[in-house]
């Protein structure tokens, strides 16, 4: 079975084809980052228009180069969470294409796709596991019991980790999108030159809050002369604080469940320091294993949508006639469509 995956939840247009026998066949991605960089952030209306402009181009390219259109058995598309306008572009296109080809169409959850994306490369990855989902809009600790059965153990009460990274980067004068730039700058910083607070690490819950850390960082920036080294020192202190919080909370979740498998997914999972420290923690403290995707699968992509579609096909009701978008669709409330 071959599954066409369509991803348009935010500002990346992703198209991929996954074969259950052969694995990932095609993975095309169009990024809008250069467009939104001019505005310092994502403009939803522009994102929707660019999806509309690029989605046909990408699919036409795939079908002409690979001559594979008649071999598609299922179309999976991101139904949520995400920007309503962007989701609607992908959903409408998927349903229209499914109707024209007379094949089933399946709406899938974007965060579940991120959660399971390491399975594209790690066939040994099994349930149950603890997952740390970290992106621009989500910071969650999830207990994954089995396919479709997830419990949110901890959630961001305000800014997500990725959002905090972007806002602090902007304070330091880095260009959008700036998460990677901040990490590169932090690598040049002097460890413990500044000490930033670790919010909520002593709280009984596994929830996160990064708005206070963001405000603290803003005050440090205002009170210091910002030469390049001082910027690096601030970036280092901020990154260390965020990663400390993420791993302290994750460690508590692992102890709580008694599990030895950890998945880190979402855009922030590309962070080099987070990867290294989580690997060290799992090997040395839990004698377990951490799974994270290759960098190309950390950010939004069609491959994870196609793969999830292949897993979900047998369990979900498939209908290409109903266009479904759920901008606030939580991973613990799938009640699968």
UniProtKB/Swiss-Prot annotation:
Naturally occurring in which organism (per UniProt): Buchnera aphidicola subsp. Schizaphis graminum (strain Sg)
Pfam families membership: TsaD (PF00814)
List of residues binding Fe cation: 110, 114, 300
Name of protein: tRNA N6-adenosine threonylcarbamoyltransferase
NCBIfam families for this protein: gcp_kae1 (TIGR00329), T6A_TsaD_YgjD (TIGR03723)
SUPFAM superfamilies, A to Z: Actin-like ATPase domain
Upper lineage: Bacteria, Pseudomonadati, Pseudomonadota, Gammaproteobacteria, Enterobacterales
Subcellular location: Cytoplasm
Alphabetical list of Gene3D superfamilies matching this protein: 3.30.420.40
Entries under InterPro entries matching the protein: ATPase_NBD, Gcp-like_dom, KAE1/TsaD, Peptidase_M22_CS, TsaD
Example GO BP: tRNA threonylcarbamoyladenosine modification
EC id: 2.3.1.234
Any one GO molecular-function label of the UniProt entry: iron ion binding
Keywords: Acyltransferase, Cytoplasm, Iron, Metal-binding, Transferase, tRNA processing
Cofactor note: Binds 1 Fe(2+) ion per subunit.
PANTHER family linked: TRNA N6-ADENOSINE THREONYLCARBAMOYLTRANSFERASE, TRNA N6-ADENOSINE THREONYLCARBAMOYLTRANSFERASE, MITOCHONDRIAL
Signal peptide span: none
CDD domains registered for this protein in UniProt: ASKHA_NBD_TsaD_bac
Reactions listed under catalytic activity: L-threonylcarbamoyladenylate + adenosine(37) in tRNA = N(6)-L-threonylcarbamoyladenosine(37) in tRNA + AMP + H(+)
Required cofactor names: Fe(2+)
Record: residues binding substrate: 133-137, 166, 179, 271
GO annotation, cellular component aspect: cytoplasm
Family in the record: Belongs to the KAE1 / TsaD family.
């Amino acid at each position: 079975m071959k599954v066409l995956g369509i991803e348009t939840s935010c500002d990346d247009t992703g198209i991929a084809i996954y074969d259950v026998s052969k694995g990932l066949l095609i993975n095309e991605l169009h990024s809008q980052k250069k467009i939104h960089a001019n505005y310092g952030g994502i403009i939803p209306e522009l994102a929707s228009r660019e999806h509309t402009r690029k989605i046909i181009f990408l699919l036409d390219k795939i079908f002409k180069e690979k001559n594979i259109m008649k071999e598609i058995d299922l179309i999976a598309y991101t139904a949520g969470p995400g920007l309503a306008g962007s989701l609607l572009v992908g959903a409408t296109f998927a349903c229209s294409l499914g109707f024209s080809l007379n094949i089933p169409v399946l709406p899938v959850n974007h965060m579940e796709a991120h959660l399971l994306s390491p399975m594209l490369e790690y066939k040994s990855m099994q349930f149950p596991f603890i997952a740390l989902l970290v992106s621009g809009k989500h910071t969650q600790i999830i207990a994954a019991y089995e396919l479709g059965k997830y419990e949110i153990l901890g959630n961001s009460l305000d800014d997500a980790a990725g959002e905090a990274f972007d806002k602090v980067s902007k304070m330091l004068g880095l260009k959008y999108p700036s998460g990677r730039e901040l990490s590169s700058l932090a690598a040049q910083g002097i460890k413990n030159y500044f000490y930033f607070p670790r919010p909520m690490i002593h709280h009984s819950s596994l929830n996160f809050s990064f708005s206070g850390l963001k405000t603290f960082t803003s005050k440090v920036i205002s009170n210091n002369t910002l030469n390049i080294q001082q910027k690096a020192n601030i970036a280092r202190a901020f990154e260390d604080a965020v990663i400390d919080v993420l791993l302290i909370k994750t460690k508590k979740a692992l102890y709580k469940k008694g599990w030895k498998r950890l998945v880190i997914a979402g855009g922030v999972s590309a962070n080099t320091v987070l990867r290294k420290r989580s690997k060290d923690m799992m090997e040395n403290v839990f004698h377990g294993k951490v799974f994270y995707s290759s960098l190309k699968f950390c950010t939004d992509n069609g491959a994870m949508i196609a793969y999830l579609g292949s897993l979900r096909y047998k369990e979900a009701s498939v209908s290409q006639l109903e266009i479904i978008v759920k901008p606030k669709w939580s991973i613990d409330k799938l009640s699968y469509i």
